Amino acid sequence: MTTLACQKLAPHPESPRHQHAGPWLVWLHGLLGSGQDWLPVAQLCGDYPSLLIDLPGHGQSVSLSADGFADISRQLSQTLQANGIREYWLAGYSLGGRIAIYHACYGRHHGLQGLLVEGGNLGLENAELRQARLQQDRQWAQRFRQEPLPQVLDDWYQQAVFADLDPQQREQLVLLRADNHGTAVAEMLEATSLGHQPWLLPALQRLNVPYTYLCGDRDHKFLQLAQQYRLPLHTLARAGHNAHRANPGAFAAQVLAFLSQSSCLPPSSLSR
């Protein structure tokens, strides 16, 4: 059994859930991040117990690897089992969002109450696009393996999806992410390339649990994606691709509103 490194946060002492085992919030970070990225939001959602997970190749799971989405989904299931988590809401950002969707659609997800995705890509619809993305990600992976990490990160955060960042914010992210291990990042990047990811929209639309899609109002790429595929979209003000970092208070408010609303929905209304 492979279990991922994680941190548990108990509910606030005054929370009605403090003495009772209820659904957990399970948080999956993006590439180059760690479970700690979610700490400000998780603390603001303190009525719920939280599990902050370090994905393979990241944080305290840096020595772990994964052989694609199915393997990571199995590792997630084993981690939940090892921590005694039977009912949970799954939230993921970017790479973590893609893993969360895959797990909800294809993994062993008994006990899953609902899904919250921030800026997660649904995949690529044809083989030509997938092959092109594989080649692109392999080039990035080669750089992560061979070049000084700050140098690669400088270029990484110049990508169009991070266009809302100013120079100071880019510099802060480069410093924050520079403690990663380039080889471990490269392996995870290749294992979870969009070129390997299935097209998730049809399975997502068939989910029998509620789900929502969260996006910064400056994240034009993923706003367009959510609107194009008519996802249940909620936007975060003054935020780009990493909305939970830019505006944790608004993000936590959206999470709590979704949990409250979804807990009151009849089964026939789920994920609609």
From Swiss-Prot:
Recorded catalytic activity of this chain's protein: 5-enolpyruvoyl-6-hydroxy-2-succinyl-cyclohex-3-ene-1-carboxylate = (1R,6R)-6-hydroxy-2-succinyl-cyclohexa-2,4-diene-1-carboxylate + pyruvate
Q: In which pathway does it act?
A: Quinol/quinone metabolism; 1,4-dihydroxy-2-naphthoate biosynthesis; 1,4-dihydroxy-2-naphthoate from chorismate: step 3/7; Quinol/quinone metabolism; menaquinone biosynthesis
The kind of enzyme this is, by top-level EC class, is lyase
Q: Which Gene3D superfamilies match?
A: alpha/beta hydrolase
Q: List the disulfide bonds.
A: none
Q: Which domain of life is it from?
A: Bacteria
Per the UniProt entry, the Enzyme Commission number(s) are 4.2.99.20
What biological process terms from GO does the record include? menaquinone biosynthetic process
Q: What keywords are assigned to this protein?
A: Lyase, Menaquinone biosynthesis
Q: Which molecular-function annotations from GO does this UniProt entry contain? A: 2-succinyl-6-hydroxy-2,4-cyclohexadiene-1-carboxylate synthase activity
Against HAMAP family, the record matches this protein to: MenH
UniProt xrefs under PANTHER family: 2-SUCCINYL-5-ENOLPYRUVYL-6-HYDROXY-3-CYCLOHEXENE-1-CARBOXYLATE SYNTHASE, PROTEIN PHYLLO, CHLOROPLASTIC
* Physiological role: Catalyzes a proton abstraction reaction that results in 2,5-elimination of pyruvate from 2-succinyl-5-enolpyruvyl-6-hydroxy-3-cyclohexene-1-carboxylate (SEPHCHC) and the formation of 2-succinyl-6-hydroxy-2,4-cyclohexadiene-1-carboxylate (SHCHC).
Under the subunit heading, UniProt states:
Monomer.
Concerning its family, UniProt says: Belongs to the AB hydrolase superfamily. MenH family.
Q: What is this protein called?
A: 2-succinyl-6-hydroxy-2,4-cyclohexadiene-1-carboxylate synthase
